[in-house]
Amino acid sequence: IIQSDFLMKMGEAFVQGHKAIQGHRTTKNYSTAYSLIDAISEEINNHIFCKGQQYLGMSSRLTGSGMGFEYQLFKTLMSEINAVGGFDKELELKLISSDAKIHYVQSAIVYDEKVSKPDVMVKQRSRWISSQYHYMKKYMPSGIVRLIKNQDLDYFNKSIQLAIPP
């Protein structure tokens, strides 16, 4: 579910020249303690990994929903990704590699249903951790090399973020 002006705000970011855009994913439901915990985690991550990263001149994170991309760029990069889970993590690094900074639009709101049961949260987080560590092993070495050779802090930063549990 998106706010009525979501597409307009994403469109404005495209008009400004951004090729990869992340909207503000926020919580649709607060029905249980687990959905509340998930919502709090989401907003902390939005503040640090979207708004904060952008403030520092680096790319926002991708959340897996509420995203927009220049079509040809997205088509090209997705053809190189074979991931079933965690595609957004690999896509982040491929976007940065192609010099497409991920822009965050805090006012473009997309609502996400949060988990409400502990067993669902455990399974979800286990999948996320597994995919993050898979991509960390795959991309952290190149992140270090790119930092040393090219002073590519954005790519290095993303590769290091994969070590942070979701």
Where do the protein language model's features map onto the residues?
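Acidic donor-binding loop at a coil-to-helix junction in glycosyltransferase catalytic cores
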Residues: 85-91
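Membrane-embedded segments
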Residues: 1-9
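Catalytic beta-strand/loop signature of glycosyltransferases that borders the donor
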Residues: 24, 102-109
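Basic/Trp-rich segment in TM-proximal cytosolic loops or flexible interdomain/linker regions
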Residues: 56-57, 116-166
